[in-house]
């Protein structure tokens, strides 16, 4: 492959994926530069990871830099998390981090280092389309369905996609580790990172308690046969169910509704029931948790999602006269779910073929056609 020594910045996390991405690009003839981003000091093993990234860069004989973006990360991600949880939402920091932190700062650094491209170890594919001389780019799911990370890149803009290279999109995890072992990379067998790095070994509840104070409130059980479920989302554009105190019975107390998410069962600390209790809704203003018994409780499931026009992001915008058939994900590693997109007053409504479990406001829904990321939206 003749790439005429194009220069590429590779985001090095210290893990095996980004290390193999750098290795493959060097093998292809690119002028590779390794960059490690220090996000936060919150008991996160960033120092060990940075050393691994540095040692891999040394073994590949490529330049290596560490960028300290802790201030930006705090402002854009940490503060965002606290703010959203306080409002009762369940945010996804990884998606925001990719579009507003990682790819943004990689691009800025690429200008400074006169780099042609940026690259990461994400398991996604990028496809260039030439339509009558007009070039555009698509984000396609990685071939390893268990590792596909296209969900996390749903908020990238056109420039970020154009400038990006994803060397691992055509590989599965086993192949990546085999390559790492073949070339004796020190992190060939390093475990994948789990969860959000910045909270380190601290439990997420304790992380939230650092800024969000405990606030005692009541827990109300809603019976699965309650009248409020009889007409649940019968019409596509009908309003969301409004839970009220008088629709159920008080069965306990909690330490703060903002600590819980829909579908959660841990932390309720209420026994004596035949089946587990799950959070089906929360009223942040009144600090009330509504719960239901059993994983088949109708309050846990959602048939229709509304995406407000200001929360819609298109990668490959489709014209929607009335509706369009798509496949969706509302969380990472979820199998594709068949759905229909409807447009009304510039808002989008997503109607699932089968009701979905534990859909939370603040999360992202991503829609696909033939494995291509078409767009995404913040769930209202």
From Swiss-Prot:
E.C. number(s) listed in UniProt:
2.8.1.13
Q: Where is this region: Interaction with tRNA?
A: 147-149, 331-332
Species assigned in the record: Karelsulcia muelleri (strain GWSS)
Query: What function is annotated for this protein?
Result: Catalyzes the 2-thiolation of uridine at the wobble position (U34) of tRNA, leading to the formation of s(2)U34.
Predominant subcellular localization, coarse grouping: cytoplasm
Task: Kindly list the residues the record flags as site (Interaction with tRNA).
Answer: 122, 363
Which biological process annotations from GO are given for this protein?
A: tRNA wobble position uridine thiolation
- Annotated protein name in UniProt: tRNA-specific 2-thiouridylase MnmA
Gene3D superfamilies, A to Z: Adenine nucleotide alpha hydrolases-like domains (2.30.30.280), HUPs (3.40.50.620), Translation factors (2.40.30.10)
**A GO molecular-function annotation:** tRNA-uridine 2-sulfurtransferase activity
Classification via CDD domains: MnmA_TRMU-like
What Pfam families does UniProt report for this protein, alphabetically?
tRNA_Me_trans, tRNA_Me_trans_C, tRNA_Me_trans_M
């Amino acid at each position: 492959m003749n790439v005429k020594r194009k220069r590429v910045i590779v985001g090095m996390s210290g893990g095996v994926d980004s290390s193999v991405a750098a290795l493959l690009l060097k093998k292809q003839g690119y002028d590779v530069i390794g960059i490690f981003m220090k996000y936060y000091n919150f008991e996160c093993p960033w120092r060990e990871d940075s050393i691994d990234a540095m040692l891999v860069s040394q073994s590949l004989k490529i330049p290596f830099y560490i960028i300290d973006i802790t201030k930006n990360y705090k402002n854009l991600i940490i503060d965002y998390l606290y703010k959203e949880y306080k409002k009762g939402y369940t945010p996804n920091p990884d998606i925001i981090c990719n579009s507003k932190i990682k790819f943004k700062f990689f691009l800025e650094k690429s200008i400074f280092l006169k780099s042609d491209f940026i690259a990461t170890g994400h398991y996604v594919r990028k496809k260039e389309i030439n339509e009558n001389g007009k070039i555009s780019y698509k984000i396609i799911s990685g071939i390893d369905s268990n590792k596909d990370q296209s969900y996390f890149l749903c908020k990238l803009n056109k420039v970020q996609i154009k400038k990006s290279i994803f060397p691992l999109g055509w590989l599965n995890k086993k192949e990546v580790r085999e390559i790492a072992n073949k070339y004796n990379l020190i992190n060939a067998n390093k475990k994948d990172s789990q969860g959000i790095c910045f909270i380190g070994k601290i439990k997420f509840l304790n992380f939230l308690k650092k800024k969000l104070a405990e606030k005692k409130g009541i827990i109300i059980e809603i019976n699965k046969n309650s009248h409020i479920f009889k007409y649940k989302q019968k019409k596509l554009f009908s309003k969301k169910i409004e839970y009220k105190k008088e629709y159920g019975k008080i069965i306990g107390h909690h330490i703060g509704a903002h600590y819980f998410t829909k579908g959660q069962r841990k932390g309720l600390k209420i026994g004596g029931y035949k089946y587990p209790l799950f959070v089906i809704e929360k009223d942040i203003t009144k600090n009330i948790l509504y719960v239901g018994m059993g994983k088949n409780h109708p309050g846990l499931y959602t048939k229709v999602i509304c995406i407000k026009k200001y929360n819609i992001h298109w990668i490959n915008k489709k014209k929607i006269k009335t509706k369009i058939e798509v496949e969706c994900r509302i969380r990472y590693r979820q199998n594709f779910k068949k759905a229909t997109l409807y447009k009304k007053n510039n808002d989008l409504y997503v109607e699932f073929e089968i009701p979905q479990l534990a859909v939370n406001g603040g999360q992202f829904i991503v829609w696909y056609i033939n494995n291509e990321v078409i767009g995404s939206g913040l769930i209202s």
